[in-house]
Amino acid sequence: MPADRIITREQLACMLLPLADPALRWEGYDDEDCGDALRIAVGNGFLAPENRTGPEGHVSGAHAEVHAKGHVSGAHAYDHAPRLMPDGHVTRQEMATVAMQACGVNYRNASSTMPVCADAALVNNNYGTNVARALYFGFMSLEPDGCFKPRRPVTIGEAAGILNRVADFAGI
């Protein structure tokens, strides 16, 4: 699989499986065809069930690639019951949360913060602390222009690199 392709939630879940407790699985209703890896990744808190679709939320990997190239306009967010969305893409701000959940650092009582980057205003509040920490720990980095690009879909190569840095940090 090419490293520059956008990673799907199912593919990322498969990469996370060695770090997960298989007894923890998402038992919510979902009529989508997905593998056990995604249910386990959600059950372990690495990924969250999604309830949005559209360019600002989660869409199929093919649609995300079109969006990343700038061929989609307008915001089309629709509310749905939480779903696993195995073919949905993973944004950089979500990947920051995955990295922090997987690294083994307990920061439950830590204060919240927002990242220091040129586009900090684009980082959703619920992801801000994880983005700041993923940057601090070196799991992720800013673009050359000083932006984090929180809503840009993550590629397979990026996800592998981030998880390798997390594994090195955690001694795995």
Give residue spans per PLM region.
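Phosphate/pyrophosphate-binding loop motifs in nucleotide- or prenyl diphosphate-using proteins
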Residues: 138
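Interaction-mediating elements
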Residues: 119, 131-134, 159
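Feature responds to low-complexity, polar/acidic, surface-exposed segments characteristic
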Residues: 1-96, 100-127, 141-154, 165-172
